[in-house]
UniProtKB/Swiss-Prot annotation:
Keywords: Amino-acid biosynthesis, Aminotransferase, Histidine biosynthesis, Pyridoxal phosphate, Transferase
Pathway annotation from the record: Amino-acid biosynthesis; L-histidine biosynthesis; L-histidine from 5-phospho-alpha-D-ribose 1-diphosphate: step 7/9
EC class (word): transferase
Protein name, as recorded: Histidinol-phosphate aminotransferase
Signal peptide: none
Family named by the database record: Belongs to the class-II pyridoxal-phosphate-dependent aminotransferase family. Histidinol-phosphate aminotransferase subfamily.
Amino acid sequence: MSTASVMDLVRDDLRAFAGYASARTSALQGDVWLNANESAWGNPADPDASTRRYPDPQPKGLRAALAQLYGCAPEQLLIGRGSDEAIDLLVRGLCVPERDAVVVTPPVFGMYAVCARLQNAPLVEVPLVDGADGLHADVPVIVQAALDAKAKLVFLCSPSNPAGSAIPLAEIEVALQALQGKAVVVVDEAYGEFSDVPSAIGLLARYDNLAVLRTLSKAHALAAARIGSLIANAELIALLRRCQAPYPVPTPCAVMAEQALSAPALAVTQRRVTEIRAERARLHAALVQVAGVRQVYPSQGNFLLVRFDDAEAAFQALLEAGVVVRDQRAVPRLSDALRITIGTPEQNDRVLGALQRKQEAA
């Protein structure tokens, strides 16, 4: 598929959009900077005055480090405020209100639908299939729904939140082939570090209707820093950058994120991912033995989706033990389910102890 094809999916009124030219986008040189109406003095709370100036909109060092981490070119990567901003940019950049649909696969991360509704884009839901191997995406049905609705965006969460299932690359490629020139397939890999399925980023060389979301919030333990990456066709990335807020990456967050991508920090992250995967298996095996647990779904994320005979009682028992989990009961088709993040071994033991005590007291 040619580069022009993916840009044909962009809203007509945005293809030549220049965006806002901030003071940091100029190539001017000097040692006295009086072009952005910044303070000439630092704040007492900022002893080295490092935050008195506006940040680099796309910090070069961080962008290069993220590109190396994910295996793409820097110009194929956009840094934003978590994956949420990237989702919003994609919807606003591609979808004409009341015309261009967005396909989602519930139960799934809610921000895809939120952004679609804020843009007044038609929302098409293709529910995950609850089978013997867990809740999984039916890719042929998703593709047909996208074609029928003339959708511009198809969001595939892999591993899926809260289901925990991952989509094989061969199935993602089926969607990319079928939707060439028609829709961008967005693969959300927020939990990719915990998965056995390789990243879809490797498919970008063949399919420019692919976009991949990554984050430092989960495996890299920087949720408060809000560092998300959108990896896609370079021309699409440039367009979405023009649609983005002028200064999306605060300097302190960029500095911390770049430090988190150093070799020593990445080695620690990898060890923790290995520990989480081991704890995920241990907790899964233990939960299926707990009376009152109806089903524990297999997971490729850092969490488990669990169905209970009495989810309210389980939720309250965990709260009484000081353990807060994600209540899924208001989510369609998950009225008996809780999502439990994989914690430390001690935290996971508290989960098991609380649920076992609940059953003993019943």
